[in-house]
Amino acid sequence: ITAISGNTTEAGGTATFGISLDTAPLTTTTVAIDLSSSNELEGTINGSVANNLTLTFDEFNWSTTQIVTLTGVDDLLEDSDQPYTIITSVTTTADPDYIGLNPLNVSVTNLDDDSFGILVTAISGNTSEAGTTATFDVRLKSAPGINVTIDISSSTEAEGIISGSVAN
């Protein structure tokens, strides 16, 4: 297994590593290595929705490195950088040199792109004594772990009052 090229990101950034065999398997024999992600909510393998991959080697391609691409998944949570593992399974083969061989797992981190905070859009329109309104939107930068309440008030109620609605 070659060294991983870096980390994945919640913005869809990828990391890669490669796998090849040290020796050729017996003629007409294949060696299969199954890969899966320990946390498909943080990273996927080769963009697979099924989140698993089987690499197959034979007497012709055993020394050719097969590249595995990992893609970060955005969870919309401010949960810091999250480590996950690409789990390799025991090889499937009839070749005695590879029976029961379990390649090393690959550790990777999905870099978080979410942050805590509140976003307020620029005000649209102006209020007037004739009753015209102005609007602005308030939203969270990322999904909260618990309910969040934001109090909004007017500094001078004689000049304007606050009313609004909640949208999800």
PLM regions: where:
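Short boundary segments that mark the start of a structured unit
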Residues: 1-168
